Amino acid sequence: MEQTWRWYGPNDPVSLDDIRQAGATGIVNALHHIPNGEVWSKEEILKRKAIIEEKGLTWSVVESVPVHEEIKTLTGNFQQWIDNYKQTLRNLAECGVDTVCYNFMPVLDWTRTDLEFEMPDGSKALRFDQIAFAAFELHILKRPGAEADYTEAEQAQALEYFNNMTADQIQQLTSNIIAGLPGAEEGYTLEEFQAQLDRYAGISKDKLREHMAYFLSQLMPVCEAHGLKLAVHPDDPPRPILGLPRIVSTIEDIDWLTEKVPSKMNGLTMCTGSYGVRGDNDLVKMIKKHGERIYFTHLRSTKREESNPMTFHEAAHLDGDVDMYNVVMAILDEEQRRAEVGDHRLIPMRPDHGHQMLDDLKKKTNPGYSAIGRLKGLAEVRGLEMALKRAFYTK
């Protein structure tokens, strides 16, 4: 696997020099300063590429080129946004960056309720609390119809949870959910947030699939002409939330996506932490079945909690519910399969969402993206990969 690291650009508190010391050789990056929907010019791409390469690193993957909300709903100026997206892909490919991660999650990117969940060892992790999220939906946002998404027991627990919250806690929970986590390009007020949700009224899972298929059908000719691979990131968490459909959550979703848009340029990001939240997702089976379409991997683990099967926190990379041993083995099998047919390019892998720990506890960091926790995760995965290669792979 190619060892990569997500870098949020020149303002990231984790520098490129830090990343080199962590042992990564590839950078996962995006031009976050360019508004959603606008074309990334070659000038801006090359400027960022030069900054990365000056440190002896490679811009391996774009994460992400954001998909404008009007593309997802096929409303307003959606065709102009698609045309802009196509031009951005052309520009990236012509500048030598040929793998693009993206997602098709409506309104929100990845979602957590607690950004400082304390682990038994004193480090801090990210957490999604089903009851806290229900309290937000039912009593803070007051989304019409939200009751249908929760059991009676969950509704009662959510009311008790809300009644025990202080004003500061209400503000913090609201901010955690709607203000935008790292990598998300949009943040909202409560009123703006509800207005965005309302735009999806009448858009079912099947309808959103149609919109995604149209979007990809427009992009594939550009991707095929330039050898640029798209790698869709799964929904996080991988289930419907806020009354919104989610369409990249299960192996059945991947089956549909690859059959509907069969171009080899229509690929996948295997994010084990996202898919792994669902107990019915067999990650190794997913990799074995769709390995040829995996162009990027995020390796992390989550732990479903006993209090509620929908509640989870981010575990250490080799702990939790993800069988990292067999996941890495399956990825290495796919790399070997490719090498046997002449494709020796390694699959980019980044250690995702490390715990905030040690000296980073005293620093301001991007949630999930502190340096030391990811350094630990990368070292653990690197060691696992090396041991597996020495034991089982001789070619």
Swiss-Prot record:
Keywords of this entry: Iron, Lyase, Manganese
Organismal lineage: Bacteria, Pseudomonadati, Pseudomonadota, Gammaproteobacteria, Vibrionales
Disulfide cysteine pairs (residue numbers): none
E.C. no: 4.2.1.8
Highest rank taxon of the organism: Bacteria
A GO molecular function held by the record: ferrous iron binding
Protein name: Mannonate dehydratase
Family from the record: Belongs to the mannonate dehydratase family.
Species in which this protein is naturally found: Vibrio parahaemolyticus serotype O3:K6 (strain RIMD 2210633)
Keyword check for Oxidoreductase: no
Enzyme class: lyase
InterPro entries recorded: Man_deHydtase (IPR004628), Xyl_isomerase-like_sf (IPR036237)
Function: Catalyzes the dehydration of D-mannonate.
